[in-house]
């Protein structure tokens, strides 16, 4: 990928005294009280910010948070908790600036956080007037938000069209390098885990990966749809019956290549979706009409762990069960530890996956942890992301 790298500009002394606008991904999960529950994305954004400060730049950083209504700012849309956490992690003041589109006062060596960019009218539709105003704020635009690389919005795409210089931050560049290592030229066998509740959003990926991977492990709501497709009963579990033909097509495509989609042989069920629900391990053929499947069973988990330990490359997206509930976390925990113990190059992405990695303390044993959810998925689909398209184009002059 031929893009300008921000690290190169810094090394060449081209950043000193310049106004640098960093589009980061600080979209972190919060509890009902607004406290940040998991700060991986904030931590991941710091190297780029520090690099800009060390190079003598006047630094502006923005991000989206949640799904606010454009033009209607509400207190819960504020990046204030993010500014506070960033200040704690960096050991310096991080002023938060509202209504910043028409101008920001920031000096070299200073860092400011610009309020939630998704509140700006025209952000999502990549409004040209908004993009030009943002581009006018800076000398150098740095895209360091892989999590938004699949969206052509004003703060991720439009500004890159009009800024004097548009480049990739260290996080974005590292994502690109890791993804090409995992997918463009993988060491085999290549095993992908695609799990989570949103089957419809991941079907394209399943179809794309079915032509690339040696094993395609499905979990969560997705596995339920595949179980249905294989003729098993799933009770009242989450599934998408209208997608059965698609699931069968994926199974057939894998089979035609001598590869497989392992269907669970045992599952963990409950009668209600609750942390205190009674967990029952059952054969996959014994699911009752009023059962909810909330995890893969121990036999299935052990079989998958064996496959993962023998893999050359592992792509992991999504927990295989409701790991937030202790009674239904065994499948995800077993798979997490198998990936950690495997000698394979592993790349993992998606918010729930990051939460599982943090819960089981295996950050150091994963080859590369992607901070992008949807963007990571679109790369898996084989798409060219808008961010890479525009940064490549700008690098080519």
Curated annotation (Swiss-Prot):
Its main location: cytoplasm. InterPro entries: Phosphoglycerate_kinase, Phosphoglycerate_kinase_CS, Phosphoglycerate_kinase_N, Phosphoglycerate_kinase_sf. It comes from the Bacteria. Pathway: Carbohydrate degradation; glycolysis; pyruvate from D-glyceraldehyde 3-phosphate: step 2/5. It comes from Albidiferax ferrireducens (strain ATCC BAA-621 / DSM 15236 / T118) (Rhodoferax ferrireducens). ATP binds at residues 202, 324, 350-353. This is Phosphoglycerate kinase. One of its GO terms (biological process) is gluconeogenesis. The gene is pgk.
